[in-house]
Amino acid sequence: MGLIAGGLGQILILMDLPIILGCAIAIAFCIYLSGAYHEDGLADMADGFGAGGDGRRISNIIHDSRLGTYGVSALSLAIIVRILLVSSLVETGLWLFVIMGSGLAVGKGFVMINRRLFEVSEFAGTATVSFLGSNIRQIVCLLLWFLPCLFIFSLEQLALGIFLCVLVSLWCGFRAKFYLGGITGDILGATAFLTELAFFLGILLLA
């Protein structure tokens, strides 16, 4: 999805569309292709943790179809930051489809890592429980997602980007464990989104 959406945005940029606008269109198209799963998870997590309370109350808020002030604020800021980070990376000379493809790959990789590290909450749906899959498949997927990054970014950029991703993913996981007793699908979606931003930030800081 990142490659497709990023490819569209790259074409628009090559047609002299402003970089920030091309990136915004690419990100919007990526959200459409993915069904906004990660964005929904981030908004739900912000609503639940922002409102507070015991695990059941937070879970009810997370699974509520309504979007609250915390969710709107977090999602709006996150999308703005994502557009700014991606457009800034494009201005350094990187191709848009490379940036978006690698960012989504890293985010999904940390989703799998957190799914391994943390227990599943009693409030999680069946999709979260069945997400794990076999060990071999998970290892192959992680290699396919992470190895291309070695040929795109410098080792220093990767080290800082992955370090920031680790901090963010652990924060999401331990916060979910403290409030919900474990992770849920929404927490994993938020983890993917936030680690993607952390990865972009790490790459940009050493660009």
What are these regions (language model features)?
Residues 57-60:
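Coiled-coil dimerization/phosphotransfer module
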Residues 1-35, 53, 64-65, 70-207:
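Hydrophobic alpha-helical transmembrane segments
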